[in-house]
Amino acid sequence: MTLLITGDSIVSAEAVWDHVTMANRELAFKAGDVIKVLDASNKDWWWGQIDDEEGWFPASFVRLWVNQEDEVEEGPSDVQNGHLDPNSDCLCLGRPLQNRDQMRANVINEIMSTERHYIKHLKDICEGYLKQCRKRRDMFSDEQLKVIFGNIEDIYRFQMGFVRDLEKQYNNDDPHLSEIGPCFLEHQDGFWIYSEYCNNHLDACMELSKLMKDSRYQHFFEACRLLQQMIDIAIDGFLLTPVQKICKYPLQLAELLKYTAQDHSDYRYVAAALAVMRNVTQQINERKRRLENIDKIAQWQASVLDWEGEDILDRSSELIYTGEMAWIYQPYGRNQQRVFFLFDHQMVLCKKDLIRRDILYYKGRIDMDKYEVVDIEDGRDDDFNVSMKNAFKLHNKETEEIHLFFAKKLEEKIRWLRAFREERKMVQEDEKIGFEISENQKRQAAMTVRKVPKQKGVNSARSVPPSYPPPQDPLNHGQYLVPDGIAQSQVFEFTEPKRSQSPFWQNFSRLTPFKK
């Protein structure tokens, strides 16, 4: 590695996970970014560049491109700028081009190797930790074990079947001829079990943090690790591996597709598998984002006066759309102006204060699971005996109740109709993968919004690597997870970029009572 750098070759590394940092001299990046490595003399922290930014980054957060030392010198590449053309063969300059079949074989071998190591880690968690915990009823309740380990046993069983099929497709003599794409397609529905695990992971970390304040639990978990002859990583590091693993599949498949010729029998299967796994990680990331927003929903509900009935979080986890419309509940009823908040499963009706327009009063809700949306053409409605423009109805399929709504503009009506379709789609997808908010997450949201204090910046000069230990990949034999002072949830993020905060939350800040 150092020889390549000192030999004036451009050495590129791909980010396996996001590196979110609050230190000025560290280099921040997202999973999938390509980093130009400038200094690898320190085994833990490397110095690299993306675009015009330079800084230190943990070596364990990146992976050197396979076959890098064997590729051809070409013209200036986007690799130098931290971006890579997926159709480009240039990952490093200054070496002769290696046979594409050998490149594909290297990627296949890497995939198989990581899968075998991953299975061992899952086995260690289930047999080394969970099995031993179940024997100690005096220390762990069933509820605690469910929070800490989630559905790790389901993941272990699924992965064993998946790896078994991978091994059948692996060509030991000629790895480049292996056809592993179909394995991902055959097991695509099974990968959704990772959603439950990832959503529960924050609860697991909090529960472990509470237990680790007691030295008995520290000694117990360490004894479990030694008894199972596991590598020197704390239990929270092992429990992080499934979160990391599901994020890594799109990166591996993208690299495999890059070195798979279009006339290869596995090409179309790998391309399809890449699309499937990108969708899986994107949806898991989306649900993680929603869980991060539930405290905002709880805060908003607390700001609404005269609230009645169940909490929003008892059924919903996402604000989809909001706006002000005219509303008639029953035939010959009075036209009323209301502010509507559409969540998954329900729509909340609020009234603005006559004097303080930023104060909201609760006026009811509509169960979206029982209603269907009916688009209405402009004209006169015989049922309500009113002239309609930019109108639509919500019709209760059981009781025949009807709500009539009037948007101010046609564009606003179209946005509402689109939002209702999105709400139904979200509900169906959540039901498919069993997405729900845990009782512990609801309690946490009801109590407070967890805030991470910002650290003061430091000199951005190159100087020396950070003094604290770097975060390490538990799939390798590292010892640490996160630098001191940096929350674990900030370091390990999902593959897909986070969506920006919904503009609706900006509206909420204007609709809170008694603003100072």
Curated annotation (Swiss-Prot):
Q: Which Gene3D superfamilies match?
A: Dbl homology (DH) domain, Pleckstrin-homology domain (PH domain)/Phosphotyrosine-binding domain (PTB), SH3 Domains
Q: Name one GO molecular function term.
A: guanyl-nucleotide exchange factor activity
Tissue-wise, where is it found? Answer: Detected in brain. Detected at low levels in heart.
Give an example GO biological process: regulation of postsynaptic specialization assembly
The compartments listed are: Cytoplasm; Postsynaptic density
- Report the residue ranges that make up the DH domain in this protein: 103-287
Q: Where is this region: Disordered?
A: 453-480
Q: Which part of the chain is the SH3 domain?
A: 8-67
Q: Which UniProt keywords apply?
A: Cytoplasm, Disease variant, Epilepsy, Guanine-nucleotide releasing factor, Phosphoprotein, SH3 domain, Synapse
Where does the PH domain lie?
A: 318-425
PTM Phosphoserine: at which residues?
S502
Which portions of the sequence form the region Interaction with GPHN? Answer: 100-110
Write out the function statement from the record.
Acts as a guanine nucleotide exchange factor (GEF) for CDC42. Promotes formation of GPHN clusters.
Describe its assembly: Interacts with GPHN.
Q: Which PANTHER family match?
A: RHO GUANINE NUCLEOTIDE EXCHANGE FACTOR 4 (PTHR47544), RHO GUANINE NUCLEOTIDE EXCHANGE FACTOR 9 (PTHR47544:SF4)
Clinical condition linked: Developmental and epileptic encephalopathy 8: A disorder characterized by hyperekplexia and early infantile epileptic encephalopathy. Neurologic features include exaggerated startle response, seizures, impaired psychomotor development, and intellectual disability. Seizures can be provoked by tactile stimulation or extreme emotion.
In Swiss-Prot or TrEMBL terms, this protein is called: Rho guanine nucleotide exchange factor 9
Gene name linked to the record: ARHGEF9
